[in-house]
């Protein structure tokens, strides 16, 4: 039986693990060969020392080797946050996914239930009537017929069951918050990824490059794992094999600046109702932040030339009813009914 203890000792001593060592350590954990105490100790040793790019890449390689895949078009993208930002905000990336799909870009959305917030992507989408436990074939059909499919992380990463108890007991963010957005079962090459802290912007952009992404924006919105309309968003963009960093304010793209309080969400049912309101065309601070993130996603997808163009397309997606139609189709297909 493989032993995690040498890797715990290495991490605890402050020594970085190579990509190969990191993959080996995660293989041990994901195959059920480590105790909950060992897993907790290893995760906290990495957290305290600070996870490195090779460690994250090795961990993702381990997760990807075990996942149940979903077939999606080559131009599909993911819009996802790491979670762990402790903000309790609305489900921005979930709402954004419908708007982007309504604008004509296939979305393979990867997400989970809340671990550190009151409502994760899966919680809100389930409250809307989407069957979050649909199988891989149904999700593939949802992407091709509705323009969007939701992949519930535990259904595709069943090996996570070995580490979930330790994560819940720790009650704090770990390397796994970073891994979810990097382990999309549809193996998308275009991503808009939100991170919970600015120090992860460039490292995650480098990991995505290492793992074969073509275009990606890694974003941090002044306390949110999304682009924000309540402050300044920092971006690390992977484009044409290069990584560049820049900042965006809502005013420079024609959006109203709001207060952080206006973006506060609630329980899943409340967030689902608010999400539906945005798709139905209601004006709000939630709509504005969704427009900003949708505009960025459309730039990443190659559908928009710039952020203002992307936002204009996002407005059209909502106001034409296209985004709402995507939601209705996804509900139907995920429950195995005709779209």
From Swiss-Prot:
InterPro entries, A to Z: Anthranilate_Pribosyl_Tfrase, Glycosyl_Trfase_fam3, Glycosyl_Trfase_fam3_N_dom, Glycosyl_Trfase_fam3_N_dom_sf, Nuc_phospho_transferase
Reactions the enzyme catalyzes: N-(5-phospho-beta-D-ribosyl)anthranilate + diphosphate = 5-phospho-alpha-D-ribose 1-diphosphate + anthranilate
Gene3D superfamilies according to UniProt: Nucleoside phosphorylase/phosphoribosyltransferase catalytic domain, Transferase, Pyrimidine Nucleoside Phosphorylase, Chain C
Cofactor(s) the protein requires to work: Mg(2+)
Record-listed Mg(2+) 1 binding positions: 93, 226
Binding positions (5-phospho-alpha-D-ribose 1-diphosphate): 81, 84-85, 89, 91-94, 109-117, 121
Cofactor details (free text): Binds 2 magnesium ions per monomer.
Keywords: Amino-acid biosynthesis, Aromatic amino acid biosynthesis, Glycosyltransferase, Magnesium, Metal-binding, Transferase, Tryptophan biosynthesis
Associated pathway: Amino-acid biosynthesis; L-tryptophan biosynthesis; L-tryptophan from chorismate: step 2/5
Family of the protein in this entry: Belongs to the anthranilate phosphoribosyltransferase family.
Protein name: Anthranilate phosphoribosyltransferase
Organism (species): Brucella suis biovar 1 (strain 1330)
């Amino acid at each position: 039986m493989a032993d995690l203890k040498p890797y715990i000792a290495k991490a605890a001593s402050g020594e970085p693990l190579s990509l190969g060592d990191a993959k080996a350590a995660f293989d041990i954990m994901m195959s059920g060969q480590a105790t909950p105490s060992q897993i907790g100790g290893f995760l906290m040793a990495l957290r305290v020392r600070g996870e490195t790019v090779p460690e994250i890449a090795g961990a993702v390689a381990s997760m990807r080797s075990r996942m149940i895949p979903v077939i999606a078009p080559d131009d599909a993208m993911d819009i996802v946050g790491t979670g762990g930002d402790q903000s309790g905000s609305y489900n921005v990336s979930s709402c954004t996914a419908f708007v982007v799909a309504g604008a004509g870009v296939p979305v393979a959305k990867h997400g989970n239930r809340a671990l550190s917030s009151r409502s994760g992507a899966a919680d809100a989408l389930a409250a809307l009537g989407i069957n979050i436990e649909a199988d891989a074939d149904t999700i593939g059909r949802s992407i091709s017929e509705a323009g969007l499919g939701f992949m519930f992380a535990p259904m595709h990463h069943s090996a996570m069951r070995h580490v979930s108890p330790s994560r819940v007991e720790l009650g704090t963010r770990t390397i796994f918050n970073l891994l979810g957005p990097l382990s999309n079962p549809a193996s998308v090459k275009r991503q808009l990824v939100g991170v919970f802290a600015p120090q992860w912007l460039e490292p995650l952009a480098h990991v995505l490059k290492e793992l074969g992404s073509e275009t990606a924006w890694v974003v941090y919105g002044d306390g949110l794992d999304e682009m924000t309309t309540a402050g300044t968003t920092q971006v690390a963009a992977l484009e044409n094999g290069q990584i560049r960093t820049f900042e965006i304010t809502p005013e420079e793209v024609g959006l109203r600046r709001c207060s952080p309080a206006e973006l506060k969400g609630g329980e899943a049912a409340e967030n689902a109702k608010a999400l539906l309101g945005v798709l139905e065309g209601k004006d709000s601070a939630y709509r504005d932040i969704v427009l900003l993130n949708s505009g960025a996603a459309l730039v990443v997808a190659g559908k928009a030339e710039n952020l203002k163009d992307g936002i204009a397309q996002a407005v059209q997606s909502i106001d034409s009813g296209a985004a709402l139609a995507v939601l209705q189709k996804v509900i139907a297909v995920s429950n195995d009914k005709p779209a």
